[in-house]
Design a protein with these regions (language model features):
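Alpha-helix capping/termination motifs at helix-coil junctions
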Residues: 14, 33, 287-290
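Helix-loop junctions that connect tandem helical modules in alpha-solenoid scaffolds
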Residues: 89-96, 134-139, 169-179, 210-215, ...
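Amphipathic alpha-helical scaffolding segments comprising HEAT/armadillo-like alpha-solenoid repeats
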Residues: 9-22, 41-55, 74-90, 115-134, ...
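Structural detector for internal amphipathic alpha-helices that build alpha-solenoid repeat scaffolds
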Residues: 1-9, 19, 27-42, 52, ...
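Short, low-complexity, Pro/Ser/Thr/Gly-rich segments in the mature regions of secreted, periplasmic
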Residues: 276-289
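Short leucine-rich amphipathic alpha-helical surface patches
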Residues: 227, 245-249
């Protein structure tokens, strides 16, 4: 497929591949999708046939069709309402772990190549909100993480309908795909700090201790920077931070002791700084949205 897409001086195979999308054999259709994806925008004539396959009985056929539409890009944006509706559907009896939603999350929201990775201009906000609300409940950490791409593309006013869902995605880590579970949690904490959301203070302090251990010796620096951004308001979370210090110094299991001590010192330095802070930025609360 890659060789076909790169070959010059030959008739385009796109029309033939489009015809293959209507053949009875699903494996043949899969192959046509993978090949068409290599042509990117040049595969625009395949959009109607691919959209038809979004209704196929086979889950993986629907996934392949969605991935190919995402690869086509701008010429396939007309299918976005249907794709967002599919994401919003979530888990079903036939798909209890929402695998369809998982792969569509990547196709639409992945920061690298997702259909919505560059802009949300013209996107129906109600459909977007429904998709994000459902997607942030996906059991897979990497799938949830893909939704962080929209956090910086929406104003605070636009974020309000999904703030409760962003909040839950911070405090309830994904049960699988834990290697990537921190992405959506950290992105949520960064968003709360950016908009000075009061609840972010305790969430950030608690996350210092509760984040996944892998690479936490690096991540703790980012988390403490967020902590300090709240200024003197962070003083109310000092007991939580002191508990984290005790945990790192004395109780953290299965983690290099030297790195645990390093994390403890990072938190100590943060406490020292916020104790002397006089900066009190204006905070807002999300209680009215929960």
């Amino acid at each position: 497929a890659m060789a076909l897409a790169r070959r010059k001086g030959i008739d385009s195979p796109v029309p033939t591949l489009v015809k293959m999308l209507d053949l009875p054999n699903t494996e043949t259709r899969y192959g046509a999708c993978r090949a068409l994806a290599q042509f990117r925008g040049k595969a625009a004539p395949a959009v109607p046939a691919l959209q038809k396959n979004l209704k196929h009985d086979d889950l993986w056929m629907r996934v392949h069709a969605a991935q190919t539409l995402a690869a086509i890009g701008q010429s396939a944006m007309s299918t976005l309402p249907e794709l967002l509706t599919m994401v919003a559907k979530g888990a079903t009896k036939e798909d209890p772990r929402a695998m369809e939603q998982r792969y569509l999350s990547f196709a639409l929201f992945n920061a690298r190549g997702g259909m919505l990775s560059r802009s949300l201009n013209g996107v129906d906000r109600e459909l977007l909100y429904k998709a994000v609300k459902a997607g942030l409940k996906n059991e897979d950490g990497r799938a949830r993480g893909s939704y962080s791409s929209i956090y910086t593309k929406l104003s605070l006013e636009e974020l309000k309908p999904i703030l409760p869902d962003i909040y839950r995605a911070i405090i309830e880590p994904s049960p699988s795909g834990i290697m990537f579970a921190d992405q959506i949690q950290t992105a949520g904490l960064e968003l709360f700090a950016k908009h000075r959301i009061s609840e972010g203070i305790e969430l950030t302090a608690a996350y210092a201790k509760n984040m996944k251990p892998h690479a936490s010796e690096h991540r703790i620096k980012t988390v403490m920077t967020l902590m300090k951004s709240y200024g003197a308001h962070s003083q109310r979370a000092i007991p939580i931070l002191e508990n984290a210090i005790d945990y790192f110094d004395n109780r953290e299991p299965d983690f290099p002791k030297r790195l645990s001590k390093q994390k403890a010192q990072t938190v100590r330095d943060t406490i020292k700084e916020i104790k002397t802070s006089t900066n009190r930025p204006k905070l807002i609360s999300i209680k009215s949205f929960l």
